[in-house]
Amino acid sequence: MGRRKIEIKAIKDDRNRSVTFLKRKGGLFKKAHELAVLCSVDVAVIIFGHNKKLYEFSSCDMRETLGRYQYYGPPHEHKGPEDFNGKRDDDDDEDETTPAPEEMQPTTQNPPAVVPAHIPSHPGFQHVNHAPSASPPISNGIPFDPRHGTPQPQGASRPSSRNHLRRVSSNLGPQQHHGTPPPPPQNGFAYIPNPSMYHPNANPNIAQQPRPPQFAHYGPQQPLPPHAIPPHPMPQPVPPHHQAPQHLPQHPHPLAQQTPAMGLSQPPHASIPQVAQPFLPEQGRNSMPPAFPTEQSQPPRPVSLPDVSSADQMVGPLKVETSPSPPHQRSLSSKSRSIFTPIDDRGSVLARHFGLGPPTCESPRTESADVKAEAKQNDSKEIKPPAQPVAPPPPPRTTADAARSQSAPDIKPPPRTNSGQLPSKRPQLKVQIPSENSDRGSATADSSSSTGNQTVTPAKANPDTNHSGVVLPPPSPSAGAILSAGATGPPNPFARPPPPGTASQNSNAYNSNNNIETPISALPSRFVSDALLPSPSSFFPEWGFGRSGPDTNMLPSPLTFPTPAVQTGPGFAREDEQEKKRKSPDSGPSIEGTAKKSKT
């Protein structure tokens, strides 16, 4: 009697609307609770407010309720705004406590009527699961048509919720509902969103870029469901393959469902990304198929297992490629090994001394061969045959004649195994330089007597090794290091044969200095003058320590741009002069340079 009727339409005034919302929301929750208790039913009410806040009431766990809704068939009764527009006059008694139609729909049978439209922004349970799925556009766009059991007005808003909720329940929904109810709605559209979850495994490359990282989550996740929640993985992959033909025309992003075919064809093409990914698909798919057999496993298996096999095949070729790669290097470097053939084939000094002291000739090289064998095993752990050929290499390296005396087929493997390590061999030339005296003392019986007093840098010795290889003259003063440097390495490209007199003088000078028998410097011979080096300033003339050109009296300026003629700042000129004074000991004319600079 005292209650006035209000027209059910949107309230424009913000204050009145907020008051009405709070009042009717409380009444709706109260009614929902009473209904749940009185009738022993599960009620879920979800309200998205204007202030972007979420209000929900649930007589039991909200996620469980939504998951159950996802797997139920078409609702037995569905109410929409049009159902209440004309009946409002008859229901005046309940008007005070019942909310507006938008708020009333979330009750028991149709909570998603409101949920769907807004669910992407749902901050609570939905948002967490919605992020991994990585396909909001797919879910929102897909399933308007496939929704068969409900009136069309709700079709627009409901499918989006259906998709998102399905993702939630696929991980969180109760297990007992998986078996029986799903089939009718599944063929409608129940699992459309799931291709986006499942096929990032099959086709992470074709899909959008954000998917592979999310697939990294699916790899760990899906091994778990087969053990913890067996039913979930089964329905997920199976329906997408059955339903893919139905929904491809309607699908805004057909990539997710075309992936079964593309996933098979892709691994051969995209070999580089597959290197990292074959393992992830194997995790996902090897864990998935065990769950499939309980339901229809035929469609997903062809898709999953071929990918796994193709992934294995991809891994296989990669392993094969990694193993052949050392042979390629060997073949390339075996060509470069031709540097050694002139020395070996002449058989010059080595052939003569090989019979005298073969152990000493081979001892340093067998060590180097062992080092190379270790390096080789590190390079290709899968190739173990080279370990056997490593034993023959020392003879072929020392002399080709000795190698030929063994057996012709043995020569072919060793160059491959050894020459693969040429890059590591060249440093060993310099490592073996200190041991040249021991080699010389034992192996070179002829030249040791004359060269015991005269040792020259191996840089200058190498050219003579070539000459001695041709004619074998009487041992020259520079033939000392022939075994260590000349036989094992290529001739020094920097070497310049010294004049005999200066060579002997230099060697005598070296020996007079504390009996230094090793080279006095490791620099190439082009930097070494005929006498002992006067000062380090002549090593690298381009460094500008001492100049021997037209600009001898000018030190190089530390500044590349012209310096100002007038002293603009006190500190600038002082620093400049200090630098020149500091350099004056190395080059005599620097004082003149400073004087000239200061005059200008």
From Swiss-Prot:
Residues 222-242, 386-397, 490-501 have a biased composition (Pro residues). Residues 151-160, 328-339, 453-468 have a biased composition (Polar residues). MADS-box transcription factor involved in the activation of the dihydroxynaphthalene (DHN)-melanin pathway and the fumiquinazoline C cluster during conidiogenesis. Specifically recognizes a DNA binding site (poly A/T stretch) identified in the promoter sequence of the gene coding for the polyketide synthase pksP and of the fumiquinazoline C cluster (fmq) promoters. Belongs to the MEF2 family. Induction: Expression is inceased two fold when the MAPK mpkB is deleted. Residues 71-518, 542-600 are annotated as: Disordered. One of its GO terms (cellular component) is nucleus. Keywords: DNA-binding, Nucleus, Transcription, Transcription regulation. Residues 243-260, 440-452, 503-515 have a biased composition (Low complexity). Pfam families: SRF-TF. It is found in: Nucleus. One of its GO terms (molecular function) is protein dimerization activity. InterPro entries: MADS-box/MEF2_TF, MEF2-like_N, TF_MADSbox, TF_MADSbox_sf. This is MADS-box transcription factor rlmA. It comes from the Eukaryota. Residues 75-89, 364-384 have a biased composition (Basic and acidic residues). Signal peptide: none annotated. Residues 1-61 form the MADS-box domain. Disruption phenotype: Affects sporulation and reduces the expression of the DHN-melanin gene cluster. Also strongly decreases the production of fumiquinazoline C. The keyword Transferase does not apply. One of its GO terms (biological process) is positive regulation of transcription by RNA polymerase II.
